[in-house]
Structures are given as structure tokens and as C-alpha cells.
UniProtKB/Swiss-Prot annotation:
Pfam families: TASL (PF15133). Transmembrane segments: none annotated. This is TLR adapter interacting with SLC15A4 on the lysosome. Interacts (via pLxIS motif) with IRF5; leading to IRF5 activation. Interacts with SLC15A4; leading to its recruitment to endolysosome. GO terms for cellular component: cytosol; endolysosome membrane; nucleoplasm. It comes from Mus musculus. It comes from the Eukaryota.
Length: 298
């Protein structure tokens, strides 16, 4: 009974010997001290000796188990710390791998485009869709839809981007005083007020917002042309009577008169006559050239 603690300690030692082999000598030293203390106990009564030996054996075995588990946990923590230090280098080092890592992010979705559409990322470097950044993708990546899937329609549409300025712009238009306006300038007068208020609310303007604005202006120009030709039986030259175009004519005339030292009225007549020569009976969509985002100053 006196060696019960020593025997129980050997049982636990055999079970976990593989996990703490580096700590054999310290554990053996502790074991020797505990068994020597147990062997030194002597009692006159057999019952007292059995009770005391059982208590000491349980106590010694508990100390042995706790010490072994503590050292095993320290050993595992040191191993995990070594693994973390070995893998401390970032995983995504190249731009392609960085794009893949961003694409896997659930919070911020990234829209990757095929190699044939890399000009979108170059010309529209600030383009966002629903808060996600548009990036280029390497052609060697697998599991990406083929380019034929983009042939049904445009890859990106400006109409899909909602503008928060529309509600505030409509409220500002209702507060404006009503004035008698001409027949041909009414349409462009309202739109010019709306565009001025919208352009002043967001600076600098991103390419996506500018694209949508230009698309709307082209559609409005088509509508104005159809209304003038069908309902009023007028020629396309009457579109020059609108306030939107005449304002630009005045600005051009003023600039030319300052540069050439000529009368403003004469320069205005020259500009209008030149525009009338360029007007044709057919209308076509102009070629739009949008500057880079870095060139726009707030």
C-alpha cells in the first residue's frame, strides 16, 4: 500500500510518455521525491497506515497528472507559436493572388472582368458597382465564365447604379418660382436647372455618374428632336432656340470676342451661322471622351 502512489504514477506515465518525452528527467526527479516521502511515513496502527497511504497516493498521483498536463500544454503552445512564426509571411503577394483574396471576401464583393475587358479597369479606375470594386483578372484562373456569356448585352450598365441625389433634386425644383417660358426652351430650361443642382451636390464626379448623365442627355436630345419634328412640324435647326444651347453660344461668343477684339454681337452671328452649316436632318450619337478620375479637381 505504501507504493500505491508510485504504481499509479507509472500507469499515467506510460499513457502520456509520447507527448512529453523531453521532460523525462524533471518528472522522474519529482517522482522520486514523492515516493520517498510516502515511504518515510510510518504509523503504529495498520488502519491508520492504510488510510494515510491511500490519501498520500491519491494526492501524489494528482500532483503528477497536473504537472504532466501543464508541461504538455506548454509544449503544445510552444509548437503552435513556432508554426505561426514560420507562416508569418503574407499569403497574397502577387496582384493576381490579392484579387482572388478580395473576391473571396463576403463583406465586400469584387467584380472581376475577363482579359478582353481590361480597358474598363484602365479607363474607369474608380468604377464601383453596389460598393464593390471592379478589377482585372488573370486569364490563367480557372472556373471563370467564358467570354460568350457577356455577348448578350453590356457588361456594365450605368442605370444599375442608383443616385441618392434624385430625391433632393426633385424637392429643390418644386421650390423654384414659376415663370413664363418659351415653347422650345421649356424642356431644356428644366433639365438645365436639374443638372446644375445635381452636379454641385457631388464633387468630384465619378466616371459612372458622368456616364449616366451623358446617356440621359442623349436620350433627352432624341426626345426633343422627335417632338419638334412630329408635333410642331419644325426642322432640327429650331433646337438652337433652346436656352441650353444658346447659353453655350453666348459663352463661346464672349470668349472669341475677347481673344479677337471683335464685337460680341458680330461674333455671335458668326458662331450661329457656323452651327447652322453643321446641322443636318439626321441625328447621331456623339463619340464621348471621358477624362480620367485623377484629372478631375474638386
Amino acid at each position: 500500500m505504501l507504493s500505491e502512489g508510485y504504481l499509479s504514477g507509472l500507469t499515467y506515465w506510460n499513457d502520456i510518455h509520447w507527448n512529453c518525452a523531453s521532460y523525462n528527467e524533471p518528472v522522474a526527479g519529482d517522482q522520486g521525491k514523492e515516493t520517498s516521502s510516502v515511504a518515510a511515513l510510518s504509523y503504529s496502527s495498520v488502519d491508520e497506515t492504510q488510510v494515510q497511504s491511500l490519501y498520500v497516493s491519491c494526492k501524489s498521483s494528482g500532483k503528477f497528472i497536473s504537472s504532466v498536463h501543464a508541461r504538455a500544454s506548454q509544449h503544445s503552445r510552444s509548437q503552435s507559436r513556432t508554426v505561426l512564426q514560420a507562416n508569418s509571411n503574407p499569403v497574397f503577394e502577387s496582384p493576381t493572388l490579392a484579387a482572388v483574396g478580395i473576391c473571396r471576401d463576403v463583406i465586400r464583393e469584387t467584380y472581376l472582368v475577363p482579359p478582353s475587358c481590361k480597358s474598363i479597369c484602365k479607363n474607369y479606375n474608380d468604377l464601383h458597382i453596389a460598393g464593390g470594386q471592379v478589377m482585372a483578372i488573370n486569364s490563367v484562373m480557372a472556373n471563370f465564365p467564358s467570354e460568350s456569356s457577356f455577348e448578350d448585352g453590356p457588361l456594365l450598365k450605368s442605370s444599375e447604379i442608383s443616385l441618392s441625389m434624385e430625391d433632393s433634386t426633385s424637392t429643390q425644383l418644386t421650390e423654384l418660382p414659376l415663370k413664363p417660358i418659351q415653347r422650345y426652351s421649356s424642356y431644356w430650361r428644366i433639365t438645365s436647372i436639374k443638372e446644375k443642382s445635381s452636379l454641385q451636390m457631388q464633387k468630384p464626379i465619378s466616371n459612372a455618374v458622368l456616364n449616366e448623365y451623358l446617356e440621359q442627355k442623349v436620350v433627352e436630345l432624341y426626345k426633343q428632336y422627335i417632338m419638334d419634328t412630329v408635333f410642331h412640324d419644325s426642322s432640327p435647326t429650331q433646337i438652337l432656340a433652346s436656352e441650353f444651347i444658346m447659353t453655350n453660344v453666348d459663352q463661346i461668343s464672349l470668349q472669341v470676342s475677347k481673344e479677337k477684339n471683335l464685337d460680341t454681337s458680330k461674333v455671335k452671328d458668326i458662331v450661329i451661322s457656323h452651327l447652322l452649316q453643321l446641322v443636318s436632318s439626321e441625328i447621331s450619337t456623339p463619340s464621348l471622351h471621358i477624362s480620367q478620375y485623377s484629372n478631375i479637381t474638386p
